[in-house]
Amino acid sequence: MKASVKVNGDRLRRIRTEQALTLRALGERSGVAFDTINKLENGHRPARLSTIRKLADALSVEPKELMKGEE
C-alpha cells in the first residue's frame, strides 16, 4: 500500500498562480497529470508522497509546504 497524504489545495493553487503556471504547464513541468493537480487543488483526493515530491520540485518548494497542516 502506498502512503498518501492530504494536500493543502489552496496553498498549491496559490504557489502555482504566483509562478504564473497553468494546470497544464505545472503538469508538464512535474510529470503529474493536470487533472490530478486540479483534483488536489480542490481537495477531491489525497496524494502519494511521490506526487507531492514531483510537484514540490517543479515549484521549487519543500514538499511540506504542500501538505495539510503545515504553515
Kindly give the residue locations of the regions a language model identified.
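DNA major-groove recognition helix of helix-turn-helix/homeodomain DNA-binding modules
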Residues: S50-E65
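Residue-level detection of the helix-turn-helix DNA-binding "recognition helix"
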Residues: T17, G31, N42-H44, R53, ...
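A short, Lys/Arg-rich alpha-helix, primarily the initiator
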Residues: M1-E18
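Short alpha-helical DNA-recognition segment
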Residues: A20-K39
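Short amphipathic recognition helices of helix-turn-helix/homeodomain-type DNA-binding modules
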Residues: E65-E71
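Helix-turn-helix DNA-binding elements, focusing on the entry/boundary residues of the two helices
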Residues: L12, L23, F34, L49-I52
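The alpha-helix within a helix-turn-helix
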Residues: R16, G27, A56
